[in-house]
Amino acid sequence: MNTSGSGIAQAHETDALDLSTMTKHEMPYGIDAIAEIRMSTPADYPAIIRMGEAADMGTLDGFEDTLVATHPSGGIAAFCRLRIYDGIAHVNPIVVDESLRGHGVGAALMKAARERYGELRFVARGYAVGFYKFIGCTPVEWSEIAPEVASDCDDCEKRDECQPLPMKYPIENEERAITPSLD
């Protein structure tokens, strides 16, 4: 991982996470649902936009710092768009194809984002809080989330239904992250 003076990793299109080098114990369960995790390219943008709209994220733009997980048969299985505010990476948003949810794709994508960018901050939709806690994320105060990200919730008509929770995915939870109990 290359880092800049700001402490944020500099991701490059050629830096794909090689899943073939990981043992089954290093990977989340069901990780065979994806071929690689890499930086997005302009060819990926239409699929990212469609997935974002299908996940009720509105129309997204600005994909310079977006990771994608590709499906073995081609196409985008998931994406994680990051925004850097005050030197901190904010996930905004992460979307996994509905048919692949529950197979470790989101966990692998979050781990790859954390490896590239360091600690991650984000706002979790209420129904996803259990997943984020499972991979090692912890709740934080709203003041720890960039106003540019938090305002998405402030202006959302579904806020009461969604029950958003500000969270972070810290570096110090590396041992616990995405490694399910093998008991």
Description of each model-found segment:
Residues 8-15, 36-47:
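A short beta-loop-alpha structural element at the N-terminal edge
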Residues 94-101, 127:
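A short, internal acetyl-CoA/4′-phosphopantetheine-binding micro-motif in the GNAT/acyltransferase core
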Residues 126-152:
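Conserved active-site alpha-helix within GNAT-family acetyltransferase domains
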Residues 65-78:
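Conserved beta-hairpin
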